[in-house]
């Protein structure tokens, strides 16, 4: 009798799970899900991008998957992306609440940063504040250029010391990108062996791999394992470590800042807290500031450094493209001390190369997950409120018919017949719409100034004993090239870049 009772409840449990995994009426098609696991077995845990493409070919540009018991819609192609992220932006601007990347924050989920915050008045207020603060601290202006050029000086010192050797540029580019955003956020740069830089960069690298790895997928698919001491708990510890480091910086700023005379992003936020006083409730608060800063630091470090790694991998293995870039740089800059971001308008080929690097790097291939804020429609399908939305940016950046050479590295993708720089509408490495990456303009300025300055002074060479280059990326929240080494030589013309 007891055994029959248990079996009955097991059957009821699985029946309920099967009902939860049924697609709503007029929902996008997709592969049949399994109870508990959903479509987890339809995706490679190491790199699901190939599976997303395989499913797109079978089910079309709008199809559905189940992440455990939760329905998700994968959107592909320029037409679908524009309808969702631009035409119906408000309907698709939410953030899912019950997933690993949201839960691994060590503080209340209502006090997260800006990237994972749901679409709300608080999110709008913080995004507006960040954009205004970045503008005030020189984003797009000469003062920001000087910060970037100053950091490049340290990168060039590293390269000069490495002449005649074979070395990995990974840490060098990560540290440079991290220091540039640190100057905006904290008003200071760090030596490359500083504990803050070393720990934060390492924590973010580990969390990037965990968040898009098998354990995060299992966390989302099988809720009953969430309290077990499994490998995903490492991400929780990493965020707690970073939170303590930023808390210490906030304490230092409180002791040294002059109210009303902000020197960096932290000062601006603390001034805003003073201005609002106790009337603001939880919209602006120190806990939110901690996660806000970590969001901005991660977004400003990982994507830029991985794009640089991808860029120099291609430039080394396409030496004719590297040489043509250098010829254009020499012609435009002549005897000037350093490049300016405004020089991009006179460097169409360099612009094309940088954008092609971004297209091939595709550093955030699934963007950050969205969810619908209302019952809505997409390409004729009905999507209930709260539906998880996954953008397959790879489908746009390599879409047939949108690019001259969709599957190969070729700057001609961004040049017209007259050799002028053009940007196709399918170029969406930062997604599109109101939740597009906050640091897009900073990233573009960094990429241009760093690549132009380094190419002006150095020749980058693929080592003879390195074998054939492998362009296959390592999958995580951000894509990164497989580790590689480079050699550098000084070019014939020598130029200095004053800080």
PLM ranges: what are they?
Residues 319-321, 440-478:
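Cytochrome P450 heme-binding "Cys pocket" and the immediately downstream C-terminal segment
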């Amino acid at each position: 009798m007891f055994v029959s009772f248990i079996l009955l409840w097991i059957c009821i449990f699985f029946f309920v799970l099967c009902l939860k995994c049924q697609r709503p009426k007029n929902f996008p098609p997709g592969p049949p899900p399994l109870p508990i696991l959903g479509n987890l077995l339809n995706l490679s845990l190491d790199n699901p991008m190939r599976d997303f493409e395989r499913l797109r070919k079978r089910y079309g540009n709008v199809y559905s998957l189940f992440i455990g018991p939760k329905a998700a819609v994968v959107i592909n192609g320029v037409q679908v992306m524009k309808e969702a992220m631009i035409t119906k932006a408000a309907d698709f601007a939410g953030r899912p609440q019950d997933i690993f990347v949201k839960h691994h924050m060590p503080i209340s989920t209502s006090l997260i940063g800006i990237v994972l915050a749901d679409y709300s008045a608080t999110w709008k207020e913080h995004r507006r504040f960040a954009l205004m603060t970045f503008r005030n601290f020189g984003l797009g202006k000469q003062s920001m250029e000087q910060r970037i050029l100053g950091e490049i000086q340290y990168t060039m010192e590293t390269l000069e010391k490495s002449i005649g050797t074979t070395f990995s540029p990974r840490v060098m580019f990560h540290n440079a990108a991290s220091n540039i955003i640190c100057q905006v956020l904290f008003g200071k740069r760090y030596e490359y062996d500083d504990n803050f830089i070393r720990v934060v960069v390492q924590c973010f690298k580990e969390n990037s791999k965990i968040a898009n790895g098998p354990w995060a997928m299992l966390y989302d698919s099988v809720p009953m394992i969430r309290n077990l001491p499994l490998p995903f708990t490492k991400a929780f510890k990493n965020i707690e470590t970073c939170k303590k480091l930023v808390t210490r910086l906030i304490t230092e700023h409180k002791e040294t800042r002059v109210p009303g005379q902000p020197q960096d992003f932290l000062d601006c936020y603390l001034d805003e807290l003073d201005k609002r006083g106790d009337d603001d409730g939880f919209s602006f608060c120190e806990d939110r500031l901690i996660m806000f800063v970590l969001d901005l630091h991660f977004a400003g470090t990982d994507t830029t450094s991985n794009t640089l790694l991808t860029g120099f991998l291609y430039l080394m293995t396409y030496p004719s493209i590297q040489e043509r870039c250098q010829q254009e740089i020499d012609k435009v800059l002549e005897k000037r001390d350093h490049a300016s971001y405004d020089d991009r308008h006179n460097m169409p080929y360099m612009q094309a190369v940088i954008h092609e690097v971004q297209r091939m790097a595709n550093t955030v291939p699934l963007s950050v997950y969205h969810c619908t804020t209302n019952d809505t429609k997409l390409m004729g399908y009905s999507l209930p409120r709260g539906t998880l939305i996954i953008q397959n940016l790879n489908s746009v950046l390599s879409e047939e018919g949108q690019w001259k050479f969709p599957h190969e590295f070729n700057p001609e993708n961004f040049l017209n017949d007259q050799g002028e720089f053009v940007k196709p509408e399918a170029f969406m490495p930062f997604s599109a719409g109101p939740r597009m990456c906050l640091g897009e303009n900073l990233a573009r300025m960094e990429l241009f100034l760093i690549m132009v300055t380094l190419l002006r002074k150095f020749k980058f060479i693929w080592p003879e004993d390195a074998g054939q280059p492998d362009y296959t990326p390592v999958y995580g929240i951000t894509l990164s090239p497989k580790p590689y080494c480079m050699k550098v030589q000084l070019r014939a013309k020598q130029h200095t870049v004053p800080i």
